[in-house]
Amino acid sequence: MSDISKASLPKAIFLMGPTASGKTALAIELRKILPVELISVDSALIYKGMDIGTAKPNAEELLAAPHRLLDIRDPSQAYSAADFRRDALAEMADITAAGRIPLLVGGTMLYFKALLEGLSPLPSADPEVRARIEQQAAEQGWESLHRQLQEIDPVAAARIHPNDPQRLSRALEVFFISGKTLTELTQTSGDALPYQVHQFAIAPASRELLHQRIEQRFHQMLASGFEAEVRALFARGDLHTDLPSIRCVGYRQMWSYLGGEISYDEMVYRGVCATRQLAKRQITWLRGWEGVHWLDSEKPEQARDEVLQVVGAIAG
């Protein structure tokens, strides 16, 4: 798309970053100054009744800056990147029609990618093919299937661990159904986002500082009643660890503790470690992201001013 035709598109802002990097605080500050409306880009914040462990904006913050796409699913329900793209596009169109600018804030990089580039045309799951793969795994082991994937799609095999049956099974399933590799299909994008997007990523300059923040925030969540929040979910009886909601960082570890699998101290240790790993994955995504303007979360006023400098012209 030419620069001229791109300039005629409606404007949007992406504010991305790892967990515990200060995205929400900056988004709220920006809303005071720019004509923006916030859309949450977070696969955990979509769930009702999961507030403390997801660091969902509190009532005061939501009053100052309402977020769209919060609390839109029960924890028993699934929600895909395709669902997000559909919902986000509808919200963006609504915001643009009102003469304002969508500010998308969050850390679920897959959602940002799906929104920006469109979704690759992957085939739907096929229960028969999946059953055949699982049968083969039961007979030969997942290591054997991983070797098979290495021959079919070495790029995907390098990214998928042999102990990750869900992703391994999906990569093989895609090939058996379509005759094309997962790598081949994911390089084929769908419809690109029809907006002129200004992209920002916020993070502390040092990894140690981020790790420190993550640990502090996990302990803060525990002090705020995180255990009671998960106990209420645990007591429902219809939720389990195969659901995306319960696999969320922190919830999975607390679930293991409540189920008597690990001690409280082990839960805290694993919860902090899992959150650090999540942040590492988010930063890895962002380092390979094109056209992103980096902000230092330890200098919030400077970060705000940098955003205003880049997008200030669109506020008029």
From Swiss-Prot:
Keywords: ATP-binding, Magnesium, Nucleotide-binding, Transferase, tRNA processing
Keyword field contains Nucleotide-binding: yes
Span list, region Interaction with substrate tRNA: 42-45, 166-170, 247-252, 280-287
Chemical reaction(s) catalysed: adenosine(37) in tRNA + dimethylallyl diphosphate = N(6)-dimethylallyladenosine(37) in tRNA + diphosphate
One record GO biological process: tRNA modification
Cofactor: Mg(2+)
Residue numbers marked as site, Interaction with substrate tRNA: T108, R130
UniProt-recorded Gene Ontology molecular function terms: ATP binding; tRNA dimethylallyltransferase activity
Gene3D superfamilies, A to Z: 1.10.20.140, Crystal structure of tRNA isopentenylpyrophosphate transferase (bh2366) domain, P-loop containing nucleotide triphosphate hydrolases
Superkingdom as given in the UniProt entry: Bacteria
Positions of substrate binding: T19, A20, S21, G22, K23, T24
InterPro entries xrefs: Dimethylallyltransferase (IPR039657), IPT (IPR018022), P-loop_NTPase (IPR027417)
E.C. numbers: 2.5.1.75
Binding, ATP: G17, P18, T19, A20, S21, G22, K23, T24
Purpose: Catalyzes the transfer of a dimethylallyl group onto the adenine at position 37 in tRNAs that read codons beginning with uridine, leading to the formation of N6-(dimethylallyl)adenosine (i(6)A).
Subunit structure: Monomer.
Family: Belongs to the IPP transferase family.
The protein's name in its UniProt record: tRNA dimethylallyltransferase
UniProt source species: Escherichia coli O157:H7
Species classification: Bacteria, Pseudomonadati, Pseudomonadota, Gammaproteobacteria, Enterobacterales
